[in-house]
Amino acid sequence: RFLAGRQPGDTVNAAHFLTLLEQETEEAVEDAFAALEAKKLLLDISQLPVKHHQGQAALRLRQEAELAEQGMDVSGLSETDPLRLYLEEIAQIPLGEDEASLAEQAAQGREPAAEKLMNLGLHRVVEIAREYAGCGVLLMDLLQEGGLALWQAIGTEDYLARRDSVIRAAMARAVTLQARANGVGQKLRQAMEDYRAVDERLLSELGRNPTLEEIALEMHMTPEDADTVRRVLEDARMLQRATAPKEEEGPEEENQAVE
């Protein structure tokens, strides 16, 4: 029902997706991701909270986010840093090959063409990983997920047209699963309930719709975090309206309704 009416290429709010899967089994979660892939839908992680890391992990994620903003300039990393070594290796792979021709050969089962296509595609994996840097998953893990998705896509129909979307899907999945492991879905679900309660109470007390800042103050969170909760709630309401069954009333039912 959550995916009803969605068209290939549409995005799905990852935060709302997580709240729906909070109490589901791992098997059900895998089925949900499989449904996303089958319908060619992409998770939008922009509303996922990413402030739940602490210590060295948080420092590294911030460092990698800055690295991505600076165009993956690895000069600030240790010379033995695995990420630096990997990115320097990718940078040495020459560009300029005819990817369309290679894709056609790979689709015919030619292994050398598939390997060349893979190496060329790794440049694109690095570029796309910049979009997800600092979102809860380390860059090396994002690059690994993106590389695996790239390899699985090589040789399939419309590879070049689908390449970026399958890489993004793999990285968005990794970020979403990490958020789930960190309990983001449960926290968001509770925050949604609290938001509704505070909104209704302030409406009654003030005699008007409360502002976002007033709700945030009552919930002891920043306006930015409250806005994230509000957006997830709005998405859930829109989905509920869009998927609600439309009941058709017969003449007899219409007369009863009037009475």
Language model: regions and residue ranges:
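Short alpha-helical segments that sit at the start of domains
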Residues: 1, 183-191
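Short acidic, hydrophobic short linear motifs in intrinsically disordered regions
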Residues: 8-20, 210-213
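Alpha-helical promoter-recognition and RNA polymerase-docking modules of transcription initiation factors
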Residues: 65-183, 194-201, 214
